[in-house]
């Protein structure tokens, strides 16, 4: 019977230790991300034009009449700066303006990070997988800045990358693939 309070105390201390370790890991992750953002801003290695290329509404999650009304050609442009860290991973800060699904102007600005792989013998071919965090502003939201945290992927050769993201959603809302070309100058 005296063992029960001791076990409860050990479990409580263990939980507090896990929360403390989790908080320390989260704090380290935020600190590392801020350092990468700061380094990209202050020490850019390339200046990059962006060309929005495609908006695709997932056909499994939309009614056909909705898809027929949507724009899937995102005319627009953007720019950014890039920095590759010691491990060869891509960091970027960007701003893009393009025609959204309703053919209205949308702005998006943020920071992106991709783990970069060079799986072939040719070191110029590369793949990337990571995330982007930023804000977007759209006509149907009265251009109020809305925070975004989205997956990011790319395939590239030398200084040109085809980057993409997927905006999750519900039926007839969200579930959009968005892609653009990025040149490193």
Swiss-Prot record:
Listed GO CC annotations: cell outer membrane
Site, as annotated: Role in the phospholipid gating: 171
Record keywords, A-Z: Acyltransferase, Cell outer membrane, Lipoprotein, Membrane, Palmitate, Signal, Transferase
Single annotated GO MF: acyltransferase activity
Keyword Signal: yes
Subcellular location, record wording: Cell outer membrane
Lipid addition sites, N-palmitoyl cysteine: 15
PROSITE patterns cross-referenced by the UniProt entry: PROKAR_LIPOPROTEIN
Top-level class of the enzyme under EC nomenclature: transferase
Annotated EC: 2.3.1.251
Described function: Transfers a fatty acid residue from the sn-1 position of a phospholipid to the N-linked hydroxyfatty acid chain on the proximal unit of lipid A or its precursors.
Family note: Belongs to the lipid A palmitoyltransferase family.
Quaternary state and interactors: Homodimer.
Name of the protein: Lipid A acyltransferase PagP
């Amino acid at each position: 019977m005296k063992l029960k309070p001791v076990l409860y105390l050990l479990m409580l201390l263990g939980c507090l230790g896990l929360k403390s370790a989790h908080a320390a890991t989260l704090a380290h992750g935020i600190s590392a991300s801020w350092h990468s953002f700061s380094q990209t801003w202050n020490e850019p290695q390339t200046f990059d034009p962006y060309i929005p290329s495609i908006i695709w509404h997932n056909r499994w999650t939309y009614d056909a009449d909705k898809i027929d009304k949507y724009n899937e050609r995102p005319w627009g442009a953007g720019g950014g700066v890039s920095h590759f860290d010691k491990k060869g991973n891509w960091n970027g800060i960007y701003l893009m303006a393009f025609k959204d699904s309703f053919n209205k102007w949308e702005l998006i600005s943020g920071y992106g990070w991709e783990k970069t792989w060079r799986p072939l013998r040719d070191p110029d071919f590369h793949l990337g997988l990571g995330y982007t965090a930023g804000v977007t502003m759209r006509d149907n939201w009265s251009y109020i800045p809305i925070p975004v945290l989205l997956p990011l992927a790319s395939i590239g050769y030398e200084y040109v990358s085809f980057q993409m993201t997927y905006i999750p959603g519900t039926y007839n809302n969200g579930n959009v693939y968005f892609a653009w070309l990025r040149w490193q100058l």
